[in-house]
Amino acid sequence: KQASTLILKELKAFQAVLKTQALKHKMTPTIGRSHGIHAEPLTFGLKVANWYEEVGRNIERIKRARQVISYGQISGAVGTFACIHPEVEGYVCAKLGLKPAPVSTQIVQRDRHAEFFTALAILAGTIDKISTEIRHLQRTEVLEVEEFFSSGQKGSSAMPHKRNPVVSEQMSGLARVVRAN
């Protein structure tokens, strides 16, 4: 539950940045692509607005999943309350910010956690999609956008003139790790 609070905080900050960029570039023309091929013109702001909306859906998905996992149980080895009164379970769960699982065995059922991790995997897919698009748009032959590059930053150990999309590459890689687990 605490992890989801941190994730939501960062997602809301990310969404705010996307909103700022979408508004800033609402009139910045770029080429739309379909299957990687030039299609019709659009604005970079529209592209970013789509990311903004998708991140918003991820925020709502994580919120719903957080509610689904916010259950606990101490109803005994097989969930029969043989050694403890249900009121004790209610008290302990309330202290932990959880709700008592209506029915359980020795554990809270894992489908609750599976839903949360599925929401994380979908979020990771969004992050990978955005970072892959930025990497593509930073390619030399496209060069429509670039990641921030601070003064003194080296682009490549062997070719310092390069401006590699390091952050986007890291985001894609970490998103794959999330989806794989």
What are these language model-derived features?
Residues 24-39, 72:
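Short, conserved phosphate-binding/catalytic loop or strand-edge motifs used
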Residues 12, 19, 40-181:
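Internal glycine-rich alpha/beta core junctions
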Residues 1-6, 33-50:
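Short His/Asp/Glu-rich catalytic/ion-coordination signatures at enzyme active sites or charged loops
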Residues 1-27:
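Hydrophobic alpha-helical hairpins/lids featuring a short glycine-rich hinge
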